[in-house]
Amino acid sequence: MKGLIQRVSEASVAVDGETIARIGPGLLLLLGVERNDTLNEAKELCRKVLSYRVFPDEQGRMNVNVQAAGGSLLVVPQFTLAADTSSGTRPGFSLAAAPELANRLYGDFVAEASGLLGAGRVGTGEFGADMKVALINDGPVTFMLESGQRGSCTKM
């Protein structure tokens, strides 16, 4: 499971021209589910996202997580994060989870985040929909996080 997090001043997601979720300061998470992912990966990545320290402390260093910063989380499903881009000029999606599994694990991730952060601080996109995501990136600060791999957090 992969998550691209971006520290934002605000973010929103719209479907068919209607805004379905909006957050103020916090994290926008684009979530990609891979074919071998399980509930364990969803919970692991959720804990990593919520505890990852990307907000400034009193000295201006990235040392505060979204929970302690009082921020919100907007979770948007994005299957293209599971693409295989290792060859050619066209991505392959054989590593992406089947829609049924991906939707279930997306829901599990959102439920875990809502339980840990509070439902009022978690917004969601719509699985399988053509979404328009708007954000004001703060920094910019963007990281790719992955479950199941030690040391897999990579600065973008």
Swiss-Prot record:
Instruction: Give the taxonomic lineage as stored in the record.
Output: Bacteria, Pseudomonadati, Pseudomonadota, Gammaproteobacteria, Pseudomonadales
Location of this chain's protein in the cell = Cytoplasm
Q: What is this protein called?
A: D-aminoacyl-tRNA deacylase
Gene of this entry: dtd
What Pfam families does UniProt report for this protein, alphabetically?
Tyr_Deacylase (PF02580)
Q: Name one GO cellular component term.
A: cytoplasm
GO annotation (BP), single? D-amino acid catabolic process
Gene source species? Marinobacter nauticus (strain ATCC 700491 / DSM 11845 / VT8) (Marinobacter aquaeolei)
Q: Report which reactions are catalysed by this protein.
A: glycyl-tRNA(Ala) + H2O = tRNA(Ala) + glycine + H(+); a D-aminoacyl-tRNA + H2O = a tRNA + a D-alpha-amino acid + H(+)
The alphabetical list of record keywords is: Cytoplasm, Hydrolase, RNA-binding, tRNA-binding
GO molecular function list: D-tyrosyl-tRNA(Tyr) deacylase activity; Gly-tRNA(Ala) deacylase activity; Ser(Gly)-tRNA(Ala) hydrolase activity; tRNA binding
What the protein does? Answer: An aminoacyl-tRNA editing enzyme that deacylates mischarged D-aminoacyl-tRNAs. Also deacylates mischarged glycyl-tRNA(Ala), protecting cells against glycine mischarging by AlaRS. Acts via tRNA-based rather than protein-based catalysis; rejects L-amino acids rather than detecting D-amino acids in the active site. By recycling D-aminoacyl-tRNA to D-amino acids and free tRNA molecules, this enzyme counteracts the toxicity associated with the formation of D-aminoacyl-tRNA entities in vivo and helps enforce protein L-homochirality.
Documented EC number(s): 3.1.1.96
Q: Where is this motif: Gly-cisPro motif, important for rejection of L-amino acids?
A: 139-140
Recorded family membership: Belongs to the DTD family.
What does the subunit section of this Swiss-Prot or TrEMBL entry state?
Homodimer.
Per the record, the domain comment is:
A Gly-cisPro motif from one monomer fits into the active site of the other monomer to allow specific chiral rejection of L-amino acids.
